[in-house]
A protein has these predicted regions:
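Short capping loops/turns at secondary-structure boundaries
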Residues: 5, 85, 119-123
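Extracellular/virion structural assembly segments
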Residues: 63-67, 77-97
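Acidic-leaning, charged glycine-interspersed low-complexity segments
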Residues: 18, 22-25, 35, 42-46, ...
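Short secondary-structure boundary micro-motifs
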Residues: 32, 66-68, 115
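Small/polar-rich, solvent-exposed N-terminal microdomains that initiate assembly or binding
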Residues: 1-62, 83, 90
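Short, low-complexity, polar/charged sequence segments that are solvent-exposed and flexible
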Residues: 50-52, 66-71, 91-95, 130
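Oligomerization/assembly interface segments of phage tail-like spikes and tubes
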Residues: 64-80, 124-136
Length: 137
């Protein structure tokens, strides 16, 4: 038995990069690859992807099979305006919904989109929580 959390995270990053069709592709990366705090190119949006949780459930006889449920957060940031972050959010949701079935995974689901604009000044932020399910990684 192994963990599926980083496999799911890498799949999400590569999927967003390869299937982006709405204008210029944002800077998409895992959160630990972002080297600076507080600095962002105000002309290009940023999407940070990070793992939140992995739960492992037993199913099958005698614990022979395991279902891994991995929660991933996709955090979109923009300095443009509300319309721009709304378009970025719609593109993220479009990509995830178009890829419900992923190779190597049971499925990929949108759990909850959350606006966090009220916490910041001069920056728009939206978080989409997604869930991967995989058996016996």
């Amino acid at each position: 038995m192994s963990s599926a959390i980083y496999t799911a995270l890498n799949d999400m990053v590569s999927m967003l990069k390869s299937e982006w069709t709405d204008g210029q592709t944002p800077n998409i990366k895992a959160i630990w690859e972002e080297n600076s705090a507080g600095f962002i190119d105000d002309r290009r949006d940023m999407i940070l992807v990070y793992p939140k949780n992995e739960s492992i459930e037993y199913f099958g006889l005698y614990g022979s099979d395991f279902l891994h449920v991995v929660d991933i957060a996709i955090e979109a940031r923009s300095y443009m305006d509300q319309e721009k972050i709304d378009n970025v959010n719609k593109e993220i949701l479009r990509i995830i919904k178009a890829n419900i079935r992923r190779t190597g995974f049971i499925d990929l689901l949108v759990v909850s989109p959350i606006s966090q604009n009220d916490q910041l000044r001069n920056m728009f932020k939206h978080v989409v929580n997604a869930r991967y399910r995989i058996d016996n990684p």
